[in-house]
Amino acid sequence: MNTEATHDQNEALTTGARLRNAREQLGLSQQAVAERLCLKVSTVRDIEEDKAPADLASTFLRGYIRSYARLVHIPEEELLPGLEKQAPLRAAKVAPMQSFSLGKRRKKRDGWLMTFTWLVLFVVIGLSGAWWWQDHKAQQEEITTMADQSSAELSSNSEQGQSVPLNTSTTTDPATTSTPPASVDTTATNTQTPAVTAPAPAVDPQQNAVVSPSQANVDTAATPVPTAATTPDGAAPLPTDQAGVTTPAADPNALVMNFTADCWLEVTDATGKKLFSGMQRKDGNLNLTGQAPYKLKIGAPAAVQIQYQGKPVDLSRFIRTNQVARLTLNAEQSPAQ
Protein backbone atom coordinates (compact mmCIF):
# COMPACT_ATOMS: atom_id res chain seq x y z
CA MET A 1 0.00 0.00 0.00
CA ASN A 2 2.78 2.42 0.91
CA THR A 3 4.75 1.47 -2.23
CA GLU A 4 1.83 2.22 -4.52
CA ALA A 5 1.23 5.55 -2.79
CA THR A 6 4.88 6.49 -3.19
CA HIS A 7 4.76 5.53 -6.88
CA ASP A 8 1.67 7.63 -7.46
CA GLN A 9 3.27 10.55 -5.63
CA ASN A 10 6.40 10.30 -7.79
CA GLU A 11 4.29 10.33 -10.93
CA ALA A 12 2.52 13.45 -9.72
CA LEU A 13 5.83 15.27 -9.31
CA THR A 14 7.50 16.78 -12.34
CA THR A 15 10.98 15.89 -13.46
CA GLY A 16 12.50 19.04 -12.02
CA ALA A 17 10.77 18.61 -8.67
CA ARG A 18 11.97 15.00 -8.36
CA LEU A 19 15.54 16.02 -9.14
CA ARG A 20 15.40 18.85 -6.61
CA ASN A 21 14.02 16.56 -3.86
CA ALA A 22 16.70 13.96 -4.53
CA ARG A 23 19.40 16.63 -4.41
CA GLU A 24 18.12 17.96 -1.09
CA GLN A 25 17.99 14.46 0.37
CA LEU A 26 21.66 14.00 -0.55
CA GLY A 27 22.48 17.40 0.97
CA LEU A 28 23.84 18.89 -2.27
CA SER A 29 23.47 22.47 -3.36
CA GLN A 30 22.81 23.73 -6.88
CA GLN A 31 26.38 25.03 -7.00
CA ALA A 32 27.76 21.57 -6.17
CA VAL A 33 25.62 19.90 -8.82
CA ALA A 34 26.65 22.51 -11.39
CA GLU A 35 30.34 21.95 -10.62
CA ARG A 36 30.03 18.14 -10.86
CA LEU A 37 28.08 18.25 -14.13
CA CYS A 38 30.19 21.14 -15.52
CA LEU A 39 27.09 23.23 -16.05
CA LYS A 40 26.04 26.71 -15.18
CA VAL A 41 24.07 27.28 -12.00
CA SER A 42 21.37 28.92 -14.10
CA THR A 43 21.05 25.75 -16.22
CA VAL A 44 20.62 23.58 -13.09
CA ARG A 45 18.01 26.03 -11.79
CA ASP A 46 16.10 25.92 -15.11
CA ILE A 47 16.07 22.09 -15.05
CA GLU A 48 14.66 22.02 -11.51
CA GLU A 49 12.01 24.59 -12.46
CA ASP A 50 11.06 22.56 -15.57
CA LYS A 51 12.10 25.36 -17.91
CA ALA A 52 13.53 24.76 -21.35
CA PRO A 53 15.99 27.50 -22.34
CA ALA A 54 15.31 28.87 -25.80
CA ASP A 55 18.99 28.91 -26.73
CA LEU A 56 19.52 25.27 -25.70
CA ALA A 57 18.69 22.39 -28.01
CA SER A 58 16.33 19.71 -26.69
CA THR A 59 18.93 17.00 -27.25
CA PHE A 60 21.41 18.74 -24.96
CA LEU A 61 18.68 19.41 -22.37
CA ARG A 62 17.70 15.71 -22.23
CA GLY A 63 21.35 14.77 -21.79
CA TYR A 64 21.76 17.23 -18.89
CA ILE A 65 18.63 15.81 -17.18
CA ARG A 66 19.94 12.24 -17.51
CA SER A 67 23.29 13.23 -16.06
CA TYR A 68 21.51 14.98 -13.19
CA ALA A 69 19.37 11.88 -12.54
CA ARG A 70 22.42 9.60 -12.41
CA LEU A 71 24.07 12.02 -9.97
CA VAL A 72 21.14 11.90 -7.51
CA HIS A 73 20.50 8.14 -8.04
CA ILE A 74 17.17 8.35 -9.87
CA PRO A 75 16.48 5.67 -12.54
CA GLU A 76 16.26 7.14 -16.03
CA GLU A 77 13.19 5.01 -16.86
CA GLU A 78 11.18 6.91 -14.27
CA LEU A 79 12.05 10.22 -15.88
CA LEU A 80 11.30 9.29 -19.50
CA PRO A 81 7.58 10.29 -19.41
CA GLY A 82 8.49 13.64 -17.94
CA LEU A 83 11.26 14.18 -20.47
CA GLU A 84 8.83 13.90 -23.37
CA LYS A 85 6.84 16.77 -21.89
CA GLN A 86 9.69 18.94 -20.67
CA ALA A 87 12.12 18.50 -23.58
CA PRO A 88 10.30 17.13 -26.60
CA LEU A 89 12.42 16.25 -29.59
CA ARG A 90 12.20 18.90 -32.25
CA ALA A 91 12.32 17.97 -35.90
CA ALA A 92 15.52 19.18 -37.49
CA LYS A 93 15.14 21.57 -40.35
CA VAL A 94 16.47 19.98 -43.48
CA ALA A 95 17.74 22.43 -46.05
CA PRO A 96 16.42 21.69 -49.50
CA MET A 97 19.04 20.13 -51.73
CA GLN A 98 20.19 22.40 -54.46
CA SER A 99 19.44 21.06 -57.86
CA PHE A 100 22.14 20.76 -60.48
CA SER A 101 19.89 22.64 -62.87
CA LEU A 102 20.55 25.84 -60.87
CA GLY A 103 24.27 25.44 -61.44
CA LYS A 104 23.69 24.84 -65.12
CA ARG A 105 21.48 27.92 -65.29
CA ARG A 106 24.17 30.00 -63.60
CA LYS A 107 26.80 28.64 -65.97
CA LYS A 108 24.60 29.50 -68.90
CA ARG A 109 24.15 33.05 -67.61
CA ASP A 110 27.90 33.41 -67.11
CA GLY A 111 28.47 32.14 -70.64
CA TRP A 112 26.12 34.77 -72.07
CA LEU A 113 27.90 37.44 -70.03
CA MET A 114 31.31 36.40 -71.35
CA THR A 115 29.96 36.32 -74.91
CA PHE A 116 28.58 39.84 -74.55
CA THR A 117 31.89 41.05 -73.07
CA TRP A 118 33.88 39.62 -75.98
CA LEU A 119 31.41 41.09 -78.45
CA VAL A 120 31.82 44.57 -76.95
CA LEU A 121 35.61 44.14 -77.02
CA PHE A 122 35.57 43.14 -80.70
CA VAL A 123 33.35 46.12 -81.54
CA VAL A 124 35.74 48.52 -79.80
CA ILE A 125 38.74 47.01 -81.59
CA GLY A 126 36.92 47.16 -84.93
CA LEU A 127 35.94 50.80 -84.46
CA SER A 128 39.51 51.70 -83.51
CA GLY A 129 40.86 49.94 -86.59
CA ALA A 130 38.30 51.62 -88.84
CA TRP A 131 39.16 55.03 -87.42
CA TRP A 132 42.88 54.43 -87.98
CA TRP A 133 42.28 53.23 -91.55
CA GLN A 134 40.13 56.25 -92.40
CA ASP A 135 42.77 58.61 -91.00
CA HIS A 136 45.52 56.84 -92.96
CA LYS A 137 43.43 56.86 -96.14
CA ALA A 138 42.68 60.58 -95.72
CA GLN A 139 46.40 61.31 -95.40
CA GLN A 140 47.17 59.29 -98.54
CA GLU A 141 44.42 61.08 -100.45
CA GLU A 142 45.76 64.43 -99.28
CA ILE A 143 49.26 63.53 -100.49
CA THR A 144 47.86 62.38 -103.83
CA THR A 145 45.85 65.59 -104.19
CA MET A 146 48.89 67.75 -103.48
CA ALA A 147 50.95 65.76 -106.00
CA ASP A 148 48.23 66.18 -108.64
CA GLN A 149 48.06 69.91 -107.98
CA SER A 150 51.84 70.14 -108.32
CA SER A 151 51.76 68.21 -111.61
CA ALA A 152 48.98 70.44 -112.93
CA GLU A 153 50.92 73.58 -112.02
CA LEU A 154 54.08 72.26 -113.65
CA SER A 155 52.21 71.34 -116.83
CA SER A 156 50.55 74.77 -116.99
CA ASN A 157 53.91 76.46 -116.52
CA SER A 158 55.42 74.34 -119.27
CA GLU A 159 52.58 75.26 -121.64
CA GLN A 160 53.00 78.97 -120.91
CA GLY A 161 56.81 78.80 -121.17
CA GLN A 162 57.20 77.28 -124.63
CA SER A 163 60.49 77.74 -126.46
CA VAL A 164 60.91 81.26 -127.81
CA PRO A 165 63.03 81.55 -131.01
CA LEU A 166 65.60 84.30 -130.82
CA ASN A 167 66.32 86.01 -134.13
CA THR A 168 70.09 86.28 -134.47
CA SER A 169 70.11 86.99 -138.21
CA THR A 170 71.14 90.58 -137.68
CA THR A 171 74.62 91.19 -138.91
CA THR A 172 77.11 91.81 -136.23
CA ASP A 173 79.63 94.56 -136.27
CA PRO A 174 82.94 93.34 -137.57
CA ALA A 175 84.60 95.34 -134.88
CA THR A 176 82.88 93.24 -132.23
CA THR A 177 83.61 89.92 -133.85
CA SER A 178 87.25 90.47 -134.61
CA THR A 179 90.06 92.13 -132.76
CA PRO A 180 92.83 93.95 -134.60
CA PRO A 181 96.22 92.37 -134.22
CA ALA A 182 97.48 94.87 -131.80
CA SER A 183 99.61 94.13 -128.84
CA VAL A 184 97.88 94.18 -125.51
CA ASP A 185 99.38 96.42 -122.92
CA THR A 186 100.44 94.42 -119.91
CA THR A 187 99.75 97.28 -117.59
CA ALA A 188 96.13 97.24 -118.61
CA THR A 189 95.81 93.57 -117.82
CA ASN A 190 97.08 94.07 -114.30
CA THR A 191 94.28 96.49 -113.58
CA GLN A 192 91.40 94.76 -111.79
CA THR A 193 88.05 95.30 -113.43
CA PRO A 194 84.69 94.59 -111.75
CA ALA A 195 83.49 92.39 -114.61
CA VAL A 196 84.80 91.14 -117.95
CA THR A 197 82.35 91.14 -120.84
CA ALA A 198 83.30 89.09 -123.87
CA PRO A 199 81.74 89.62 -127.27
CA ALA A 200 79.28 87.00 -128.42
CA PRO A 201 80.61 84.47 -130.94
CA ALA A 202 79.57 84.74 -134.54
CA VAL A 203 76.60 82.58 -135.39
CA ASP A 204 74.96 81.50 -138.54
CA PRO A 205 72.41 84.09 -139.62
CA GLN A 206 69.96 81.33 -140.51
CA GLN A 207 70.29 79.55 -137.17
CA ASN A 208 67.84 80.32 -134.38
CA ALA A 209 68.73 79.74 -130.74
CA VAL A 210 66.08 78.24 -128.51
CA VAL A 211 66.01 79.43 -124.91
CA SER A 212 63.62 78.08 -122.30
CA PRO A 213 62.28 80.32 -119.51
CA SER A 214 64.33 78.48 -116.93
CA GLN A 215 67.49 79.19 -118.95
CA ALA A 216 66.62 82.83 -119.47
CA ASN A 217 66.96 83.54 -115.74
CA VAL A 218 70.48 82.15 -115.46
CA ASP A 219 73.03 84.77 -114.36
CA THR A 220 75.37 85.51 -117.23
CA ALA A 221 78.16 86.35 -114.82
CA ALA A 222 78.38 82.67 -113.82
CA THR A 223 78.54 81.45 -117.47
CA PRO A 224 82.02 80.91 -118.91
CA VAL A 225 82.74 83.13 -121.93
CA PRO A 226 84.47 81.49 -124.90
CA THR A 227 87.28 83.96 -125.56
CA ALA A 228 89.16 81.75 -127.96
CA ALA A 229 86.63 82.28 -130.74
CA THR A 230 86.88 86.05 -130.63
CA THR A 231 90.59 86.47 -130.01
CA PRO A 232 92.71 86.36 -133.13
CA ASP A 233 95.93 84.45 -133.40
CA GLY A 234 98.86 86.15 -131.78
CA ALA A 235 96.81 88.10 -129.29
CA ALA A 236 97.51 87.56 -125.63
CA PRO A 237 94.62 85.97 -123.67
CA LEU A 238 93.09 87.93 -120.86
CA PRO A 239 94.19 86.73 -117.42
CA THR A 240 90.97 85.67 -115.78
CA ASP A 241 92.67 85.10 -112.45
CA GLN A 242 93.44 88.83 -112.26
CA ALA A 243 90.04 89.99 -113.47
CA GLY A 244 88.91 90.78 -109.94
CA VAL A 245 85.77 88.60 -110.17
CA THR A 246 84.68 87.48 -106.66
CA THR A 247 82.24 84.66 -105.87
CA PRO A 248 79.00 85.72 -104.13
CA ALA A 249 78.67 85.02 -100.39
CA ALA A 250 76.50 82.10 -99.21
CA ASP A 251 72.89 83.05 -98.41
CA PRO A 252 72.25 82.78 -94.63
CA ASN A 253 68.62 81.76 -95.37
CA ALA A 254 69.63 78.81 -97.56
CA LEU A 255 67.49 75.69 -97.14
CA VAL A 256 69.27 72.35 -97.67
CA MET A 257 67.37 69.07 -97.92
CA ASN A 258 68.73 65.53 -98.30
CA PHE A 259 66.35 62.68 -99.21
CA THR A 260 66.70 59.08 -98.02
CA ALA A 261 63.57 57.91 -99.87
CA ASP A 262 61.06 59.15 -102.43
CA CYS A 263 59.17 62.13 -101.02
CA TRP A 264 56.74 64.76 -102.25
CA LEU A 265 57.15 68.30 -100.92
CA GLU A 266 56.25 71.91 -101.56
CA VAL A 267 58.31 74.94 -100.45
CA THR A 268 57.00 78.53 -100.50
CA ASP A 269 58.85 81.64 -99.37
CA ALA A 270 57.51 84.78 -97.67
CA THR A 271 56.50 86.39 -100.98
CA GLY A 272 54.26 83.44 -101.87
CA LYS A 273 56.64 82.17 -104.55
CA LYS A 274 56.85 78.42 -104.84
CA LEU A 275 60.52 77.54 -104.70
CA PHE A 276 59.80 73.85 -105.30
CA SER A 277 56.74 71.67 -105.72
CA GLY A 278 57.00 68.06 -106.79
CA MET A 279 58.53 64.67 -106.12
CA GLN A 280 62.11 64.13 -105.01
CA ARG A 281 63.76 60.75 -105.49
CA LYS A 282 65.91 58.77 -103.09
CA ASP A 283 69.48 60.06 -102.49
CA GLY A 284 68.49 63.44 -103.95
CA ASN A 285 69.67 66.83 -102.68
CA LEU A 286 67.84 70.14 -102.85
CA ASN A 287 69.26 73.61 -102.12
CA LEU A 288 66.74 76.46 -102.08
CA THR A 289 67.16 80.17 -101.47
CA GLY A 290 64.41 82.71 -100.99
CA GLN A 291 62.94 85.20 -98.60
CA ALA A 292 62.27 83.80 -95.12
CA PRO A 293 60.10 82.54 -93.57
CA TYR A 294 59.61 79.35 -95.58
CA LYS A 295 56.40 77.32 -95.56
CA LEU A 296 56.92 73.60 -96.13
CA LYS A 297 54.56 70.74 -96.89
CA ILE A 298 56.23 67.33 -96.71
CA GLY A 299 54.39 64.13 -97.59
CA ALA A 300 56.88 61.74 -95.93
CA PRO A 301 58.75 63.53 -93.11
CA ALA A 302 60.81 60.42 -92.34
CA ALA A 303 62.36 60.48 -95.82
CA VAL A 304 63.94 63.95 -95.64
CA GLN A 305 66.61 65.67 -93.54
CA ILE A 306 66.39 69.47 -93.47
CA GLN A 307 69.06 71.99 -92.54
CA TYR A 308 68.19 75.67 -92.13
CA GLN A 309 70.85 78.27 -91.32
CA GLY A 310 73.31 75.38 -90.92
CA LYS A 311 71.24 73.66 -88.20
CA PRO A 312 69.04 70.55 -88.53
CA VAL A 313 65.26 70.93 -88.29
CA ASP A 314 63.44 68.55 -85.92
CA LEU A 315 60.66 66.57 -87.66
CA SER A 316 60.25 63.88 -84.99
CA ARG A 317 56.73 64.96 -83.97
CA PHE A 318 55.49 64.42 -87.54
CA ILE A 319 57.37 61.13 -87.87
CA ARG A 320 55.83 59.75 -84.67
CA THR A 321 52.28 60.53 -85.80
CA ASN A 322 53.00 59.47 -89.41
CA GLN A 323 51.22 62.46 -90.91
CA VAL A 324 51.90 65.12 -93.52
CA ALA A 325 54.28 67.74 -92.13
CA ARG A 326 53.18 71.38 -92.38
CA LEU A 327 55.68 73.75 -90.82
CA THR A 328 57.09 77.24 -91.11
CA LEU A 329 60.80 78.03 -90.80
CA ASN A 330 61.26 81.61 -89.65
CA ALA A 331 64.41 83.66 -89.23
CA GLU A 332 64.97 82.31 -85.70
CA GLN A 333 64.85 78.73 -87.04
CA SER A 334 61.93 77.68 -84.86
CA PRO A 335 59.67 75.44 -86.93
CA ALA A 336 56.04 76.13 -86.24
CA GLN A 337 53.04 74.33 -87.63
Swiss-Prot record:
<feature type="region of interest" description="Disordered">
    <location>
        <begin position="145"/>
        <end position="218"/>
    </location>
</feature>
<comment type="function">
    <text>Cytoskeletal protein that is involved in cell-shape control through regulation of the length of the long axis.</text>
</comment>
<feature type="transmembrane region" description="Helical; Signal-anchor for type II membrane protein">
    <location>
        <begin position="112"/>
        <end position="132"/>
    </location>
</feature>
<keyword id="KW-1003">Cell membrane</keyword>
<dbReference type="Pfam" id="PF13464">
    <property type="entry name" value="RodZ_C"/>
</dbReference>
<keyword id="KW-0735">Signal-anchor</keyword>
<keyword id="KW-1133">Transmembrane helix</keyword>
<feature type="compositionally biased region" description="Polar residues">
    <location>
        <begin position="145"/>
        <end position="167"/>
    </location>
</feature>
<dbReference type="Pfam" id="PF13413">
    <property type="entry name" value="HTH_25"/>
</dbReference>
<comment type="similarity">
    <text>Belongs to the RodZ family.</text>
</comment>
<feature type="domain" description="HTH cro/C1-type">
    <location>
        <begin position="19"/>
        <end position="71"/>
    </location>
</feature>
<dbReference type="GO" id="GO:0005886">
    <property type="term" value="C:plasma membrane"/>
</dbReference>
<feature type="compositionally biased region" description="Low complexity">
    <location>
        <begin position="168"/>
        <end position="207"/>
    </location>
</feature>
<feature type="DNA-binding region" description="H-T-H motif">
    <location>
        <begin position="30"/>
        <end position="49"/>
    </location>
</feature>
<feature type="topological domain" description="Periplasmic">
    <location>
        <begin position="133"/>
        <end position="337"/>
    </location>
</feature>
<dbReference type="InterPro" id="IPR023690">
    <property type="entry name" value="RodZ"/>
</dbReference>
<feature type="topological domain" description="Cytoplasmic">
    <location>
        <begin position="1"/>
        <end position="111"/>
    </location>
</feature>
<dbReference type="InterPro" id="IPR001387">
    <property type="entry name" value="Cro/C1-type_HTH"/>
</dbReference>
<keyword id="KW-0472">Membrane</keyword>
<feature type="compositionally biased region" description="Polar residues">
    <location>
        <begin position="208"/>
        <end position="218"/>
    </location>
</feature>
<keyword id="KW-0997">Cell inner membrane</keyword>
<dbReference type="GO" id="GO:0008360">
    <property type="term" value="P:regulation of cell shape"/>
</dbReference>
<dbReference type="InterPro" id="IPR010982">
    <property type="entry name" value="Lambda_DNA-bd_dom_sf"/>
</dbReference>
<keyword id="KW-0238">DNA-binding</keyword>
<dbReference type="InterPro" id="IPR025194">
    <property type="entry name" value="RodZ-like_C"/>
</dbReference>
<protein>
    <recommendedName>
        <fullName>Cytoskeleton protein RodZ</fullName>
    </recommendedName>
</protein>
<dbReference type="InterPro" id="IPR050400">
    <property type="entry name" value="Bact_Cytoskel_RodZ"/>
</dbReference>
<dbReference type="GO" id="GO:0003677">
    <property type="term" value="F:DNA binding"/>
</dbReference>
<keyword id="KW-0812">Transmembrane</keyword>
<keyword id="KW-0133">Cell shape</keyword>
